[in-house]
């Protein structure tokens, strides 16, 4: 093999993924992202990992070119490399595919024989799904809807499937005076969101509710007078089993957020651009054949939103392969 710089390759991504995933398990990656200067002792205390282990790990990251050495004098200090966040994004796709979705892929034969039983037997780790989705999303599908929302300057934002509250906290930081309501099925995620809001000094501006988003069909008080209703990769969870509920939910959003805009971020089943095709096809296959979900095309989403009563619907592509942002208003 010629000794040439080949840029990003399968092997370079694999090496980076191994090291970054180890760091994620240690709890070091977030520390590296937040701290301008890092040393082993400080990182070890923050993560609760033996200092010698963290020291060896940081040394390996520097040898891989993932972080930079600021000083070799003891204690050695480091900082994240100039392409650290970009690499996190790239590795996020590998990690989502081969770690978060490992229970599905590793047991594909059982899924083919008894899908319903296999889904119960081999659930994915919610924590892994959330973390790898964040790694993908921070560069690929968070910025566009967030920029669109900031441009609209809303006073009240409702987030359907709010998770640990990161989206709403970022929005309220960018939009002074705004308030937010988050709705999520997971009680543990809601608890995390409440703590995060308190740590951010936003408890008086944020409300988090543990409930399925379907509750809005019967009680729309939480979305009343919302300027923005945001639903990021959550609506497809209602398809195909609860399609009538999805339609009713869209009607409720249209009826009760009278002057508001509904922003849906989701995936389409088939993409035409060559850079999108492989991941979009794989994402659709996993959701369809391993999770009993059905993704809608751009035209199907547009038709649903018009039928729900919206008069203006716009569809935009994202930097996430197969990802689309739909903005609907009256």
Predicted regions and their residues:
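A short, conserved alpha-helix within the catalytic core of class I
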Residues: 238-252
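Conserved SAM-binding loop of SAM-dependent methyltransferases across substrates and taxa
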Residues: 164-176
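Conserved alpha-helix/loop element of class I SAM-dependent methyltransferases that forms part
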Residues: 136-155
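C-terminal alpha-helical "lid/dimerization" subdomain adjacent to the S-adenosyl-L-methionine
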Residues: 265-308, 312-316
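N-terminal accessory segments
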Residues: 1-104
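Conserved class I S-adenosyl-L-methionine
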Residues: 153-163
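Conserved SAM/SAH-binding beta-strand->alpha-helix loop
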Residues: 186-188
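Conserved SAM-binding loop
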Residues: 193-194
């Amino acid at each position: 093999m010629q000794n040439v710089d080949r840029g990003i390759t399968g092997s370079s991504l694999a090496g980076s993924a191994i090291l970054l995933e180890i760091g994620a398990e240690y709890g070091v990656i977030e520390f590296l992202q937040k701290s301008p200067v890092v040393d082993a002792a400080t990182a070890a205390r923050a993560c609760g990992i033996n200092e010698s282990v963290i020291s060896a790990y940081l040394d390996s990251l520097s040898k891989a070119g993932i972080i930079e050495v600021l000083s070799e004098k003891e204690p050695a200090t480091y900082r994240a490399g100039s392409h650290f966040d970009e690499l996190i994004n790239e590795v996020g796709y590998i990690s989502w595919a081969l770690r978060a979705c490992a229970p599905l892929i590793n047991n594909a034969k059982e899924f083919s024989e008894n899908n319903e039983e296999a889904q119960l037997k081999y659930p994915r780790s919610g924590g892994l799904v959330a973390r790898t989705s964040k790694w993908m999303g921070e560069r690929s599908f968070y910025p566009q809807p967030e920029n669109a929302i900031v441009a609209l300057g809303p006073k009240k934002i409702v987030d359907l499937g709010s998770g640990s509250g990161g989206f709403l906290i970022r929005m309220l930081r960018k939009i002074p005076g705004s308030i937010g309501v988050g709705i999520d099925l997971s009680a543990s995620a809601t608890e995390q969101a409440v703590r995060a809001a308190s740590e951010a000094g936003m408890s008086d501006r944020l409300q988090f509710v543990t409930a399925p988003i379907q509750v809005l069909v019967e009680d729309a008080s939480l979305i009343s007078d919302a300027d923005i209703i945001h639903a990021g990769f959550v609506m497809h969870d209602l398809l195909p089993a609860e399609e009538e509920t999805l339609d009713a939910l869209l009607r409720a959003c249209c009826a009760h957020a009278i002057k508001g805009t509904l922003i849906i971020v989701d995936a389409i089943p088939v993409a035409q651009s060559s850079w999108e095709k492989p991941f979009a096809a794989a994402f659709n296959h996993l959701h369809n054949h391993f999770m009993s979900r059905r993704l809608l095309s751009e035209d199907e989403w547009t038709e649903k939103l018009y039928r729900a009563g919206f008069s203006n619907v716009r569809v935009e592509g994202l930097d996430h392969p197969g990802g689309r942002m739909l903005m609907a208003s009256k």
